[in-house]
Regions:
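Intrinsically disordered, low-complexity Pro/Gly/Ser/Thr-rich segments with frequent PxxP/GP/PP motifs
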Residues: 284-299, 653-685
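Beta-strand/loop-rich accessory regions of lumenal/periplasmic or secreted enzymes
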Residues: 104, 113, 161, 206, ...
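Extended carbohydrate-recognition surfaces in non-catalytic/accessory domains of CAZymes
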Residues: 20-158, 208, 212-216, 221-224, ...
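Accessory beta-strand-rich segments of carbohydrate-active enzymes
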Residues: 23-31, 69-73, 101-105, 109, ...
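Surface beta-strand/loop "capping" patches
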Residues: 235-264, 605-642, 731-748
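Extended acidic/polar, glycine-enriched regions
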Residues: 194-197, 259-337, 684, 692-737
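Extended substrate-binding grooves/exosites of carbohydrate-active enzymes
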Residues: 20-54, 173, 209-212, 218, ...
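Glycine/proline-rich low-complexity spacer/linker segments in large multi-domain proteins
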Residues: 22-39, 53-55, 175, 195-232, ...
């Protein structure tokens, strides 16, 4: 008994001492006791459950979502340090739902900054140190009941996303620590739990040393952003399972390598099912630790964004004849290659019609529901977006599942951005203190997402400079995963990126690169900035992309406006952006709203331009007089037999004929001439004739209904001819009867009067300041008719500071000189000489005789 008491005391002392350490300021400590990362899967009790794929229905699953006791403090040094004790009294604490973010529930304010850290208004960067003041801390407590039938099993806690870090305790004992806000943290709780009631407690800091690597251009929020749960495993289980599909040189037959890491020994039976559930291949491996096997598949259906066909691998772990657990894994057969300065998917140089997407919801912030994710993919499909970059961090696991299912190419980015440190000598890419964090974040991104066929590229991070830390990450990934390309924008065209993926390379620079001899494909990771009134020059980008083989597309910044749904003091709802919450936090104002769609997912006007330019069916003239057009199929894998065409003939804007082509057989990357049965006979030759052709789905698919228009084109059969002005029959006026009079006796104004009008010119600046016609005043009082060389700046103008660069053009009375010569008798010819300020002495209108 004395030994037990002593052991207990030592344990408590160790826990208390540990809790006083500063892991949140130590870049060498990014985790303590965190379970190794593995691919995203869930182990079910039997095959039927595995095929249904609903982990929430499994007896091995228990949610931690819902209400937690919650206590928030403004400053880190005010945080409670004993709240995790079992006998701690939390009756005065609030309730907060998990997942849920503090700032959206009344605890602190959101911060939006683009470049620079959220503390930039109060604290000078000094990595790894972060502020104590305004470093909010949230403490959580929850009592749970462990199911009785989990006895003898290993029990893990899964925290999907916690910003910016977390300390975890169970029943008063310290369990572990984790950083990296956008990847799950899992902990083995087996030795800390007891039968029946248990206390789980964790503490989260708004900022930690890891925040230096999370300086992304988005809302800075805190708390729990994704689902949290417990799951149970038998003592012997599959720790990890990786699938690597491949195709032969002809892109016909496939192989599937399955690599497993077994805890304990056992036999794993493998079978591959096609989309109809038919078994197409089997294998079996036996052993412990790391084992692998290859499966051959004859001519499998291939996965692409155009044809997202998925197979299902069923991995059954057995102990003798008894099933221990069953893991389902979705498999897509596709091959990624770099050849001749192009990225090939299944042998084809696909075009990436992409957008950058932040994980953001107007009501939940980082908490994005499955329904919202599906809505986002539906919008992408509606507007012909076929690729997404997970800017600038790993997304919810479900997002990749949905991209696999519905067909979206993914650039999977690691949670590394240190933009606020700049790109020079201070960049964290060159700082050895942060080498471990760079590596771990990239490793865990790959280890978790490896099985997703939608992931085409890995991205090392975003706007974080370049240096040895990224070089090491690139080398590790290329050794770990030889089936994908790796990109990083700051690597430029060096050997540490497979793709040249610049930001906002203009037309000239893009074309110069395409004409050069660098053997890397050009795919802009950000381009065509979609803020406000934008995309006016989008077609010009795609003229180049469609012209040069190694220019393979880009990702528009960005997909969705990031504003939050907020309310005024009077309860009126509005979309809030940076600066709306308080006057003291740093803010980059509305620069967070750069989306193709609004926060509620309604398309912004410029989205329609994107949808058109991104379409993959194009019509060009062939013999329009006889109704013949060329139809080009820009798809790489899909025939047009799943679409039909509708056409309409317009005469001066009015529809006069319509028709349909039901059968379109146009192979990928091919052009075919088709006949449209319209006739121009009987239509006045004075009328403009236009031909509209739209392509629509025959059947519902990938979230789109039957009849949905995926592409539309307009051709001119007969152009509009403006009526000619008949100058031969102009009404003749007797100039002797309409000669105006000029009064120059006013000190300020030159007055010109006629029978039905009066015009006053200001002698100081030469501008028309009064104009009356038939007794009606045409200019408001004190108004002047002045030249205007200005328009309201757009958001993108202001982003480039053009409103200041070109401010001179906004000034009324900008330096202008012009001469007016009227065809009137010599004594009345007027030549105003107008100078911009400062005006020369005596400058005014003057009458001249010629």
């Amino acid at each position: 008994m004395k030994l037990n008491v002593l052991a207990c005391c030592l344990s408590l002392l160790g826990t208390a001492a540990f809790a006083q350490k500063n892991e949140w300021r130590d870049p060498n400590v990014n985790e303590i006791n965190r379970a190794p990362m593995h691919t995203n899967y869930f182990a079910y009790e039997d095959e039927n459950s595995a095929l249904k794929g609903c982990k929430e229905s499994s007896g091995n699953f228990m949610t931690l979502n819902g209400n937690w006791k919650f206590f928030w403090v403004k400053n880190a040094d005010m945080r409670p340090t004993d709240f995790y004790q079992v006998n701690f009294n939390d009756k005065g604490w609030d309730n907060l739902k998990v997942p849920g973010l503090w700032e959206l529930n009344g605890y602190g304010d959101p911060i939006y900054v683009n470049v620079g850290y959220p503390w930039r208004s109060q604290f000078k960067n000094n990595p790894p140190e972060v502020p104590t003041e305004n470093n909010h801390v949230g403490s959580y407590r929850k009592e749970i009941m462990v199911p009785a039938d989990w006895k003898g099993k290993e029990i893990f806690a899964h925290f999907g996303s916690v910003t910016s870090n977390m300390y975890l305790w169970v029943n008063g004992q310290f369990v572990g620590y984790s950083e990296d806000s956008k990847l799950e943290a899992e902990f083995n709780l087996t030795k800390y739990l007891k039968p029946g009631k248990n206390l789980i407690a964790f503490q989260v800091f708004r900022w930690c040393d890891g925040t230096y690597l999370e300086d992304q251009d988005f809302l800075r929020l805190s708390g729990v952003g994704r689902d949290c749960y417990l799951y149970a495993r038998t003592p012997k289980y599959i720790q990890d399972i990786r699938v690597t599909p491949d195709l032969d040189a002809q892109y016909k037959d496939g192989t599937l390598n399955v690599s497993l890491n077994l805890k304990g020994s056992g036999t794993v039976d493998l079978k591959l099912l096609d989309k109809a559930g038919k078994e197409v291949a089997t294998s079996s491996v036996k052993g412990s630790g790391k084992v692998s096997t290859d499966m051959a598949i004859s001519n499998p259906e291939k996965w692409t964004a155009e044809t997202p066909v998925l197979y299902t691998l069923i991995a059954t772990l057995k102990n003798g004849s008894n099933t221990t657990e069953v893991i389902p894994v979705k498999v897509g057969f596709r091959k990624i290659e770099l050849k001749n300065a192009q990225i090939l998917v299944n042998g084809q140089p696909v075009l990436f019609k992409g957008a950058d997407r932040h994980e953001m919801d107007p009501d939940g912030g980082y908490v994005v529901s499955p329904e919202r994710m599906i809505q986002d993919i539906k919008v992408m499909k509606e507007y012909n977006i076929n690729a997404v970059r997970t800017c600038h961090y790993p997304d919810n696991n479900l997002w990749y599942d949905l991209c696999d299912k519905y067909g979206i190419y993914v650039v999977a980015e690691a949670n590394v951005e240190s933009h606020g440190m700049g790109y020079g000598d201070k960049t964290l890419a060159k700082n050895p203190l942060f080498a471990k964090a760079h590596m771990e974040r990239n490793q865990r991104n790959v280890q978790r997402g490896y099985n997703h066929p939608s992931i085409i590229f890995w991205s090392l991070g975003n706007e974080a400079g370049m240096g040895p830390n990224f070089e090491a990450c690139y080398t590790w990934i290329k050794n770990e995963d030889k089936s994908r390309a790796v990109q990083y924008e700051q690597a430029r065209t060096s050997e540490f990126t497979d793709i040249y993926c610049p930001m906002y390379r203009d037309y000239k620079g893009s074309e110069e690169y395409c004409k050069g001899d660098i053997d890397k494909p050009l795919i802009q990771c950000e381009y065509a900035h979609a803020m406000g009134n934008s995309q006016g020059g989008f077609k010009e980008y795609w003229d180049l992309i469609r012209k040069y083989p190694k220019y393979q597309g880009g990702f528009i910044w960005d997909f969705v406006d990031q504003s939050l749904r907020w309310k005024t003091k009077d309860g009126v709802p509005f979309y809030a952006y940076g600066g709306d919450w308080n006057k003291y936090d740093a803010s980059d104002n509305n620069f967070m709203d750069n989306g193709l769609i609004s926060p509620d997912r309604k398309p912004n006007p410029h989205m329609h331009e994107v949808g058109h330019i991104y379409q993959s069916i194009w019509v060009t003239p062939s013999d329009l007089a006889n109704g013949v057009v060329n139809v080009y199929n820009e798809n790489f894998f899909r025939n047009l037999d799943g679409y039909y065409a509708e056409w309409e003939l317009l005469a001066n804007g009015e529809v006069v004929q319509t028709g349909m082509v039901k059968d379109l057989e146009v192979a990928p990357q091919q052009t075919k001439s088709i006949k449209l049965n319209y006739s121009t006979e009987g239509i006045c030759k004075c009328k403009e004739l236009l031909l509209n052709v739209a392509f629509k789905l025959k059947k519902a698919e990938t979230l789109l209904p039957a009849g949905y228009t995926v592409a539309k084109n307009q051709l001119t059969i007969r152009p509009y001819n403006a009526p000619k002005l008949d100058l031969q029959n102009v009404h003749q006026v007797n100039i002797e009867t309409v000669i105006p009079t000029i009064k120059d006796n006013d000190i300020n104004y030159l007055i010109v009067e006629g029978e039905n009008f009066r015009m006053d010119f200001d002698k100081h600046d030469g501008f028309l300041c009064r104009y009356d016609v038939n007794g009606m005043t045409m200019l408001k009082e004190d108004g002047k008719l002045t030249p205007n060389f200005w328009r309201a700046p757009t958001d993108n103008d202001m982003g480039a500071n053009l409103q200041n660069k070109y401010a001179a053009w906004k000034v009324s009375g900008v330096a202008v000189q012009h001469t007016l010569i009227a065809e009137v008798p010599a004594q009345l010819q007027v030549a105003p000489v107008v100078h911009g300020p400062p005006y020369p002495a005596g400058a005014a209108f003057r009458c001249i005789a010629v």
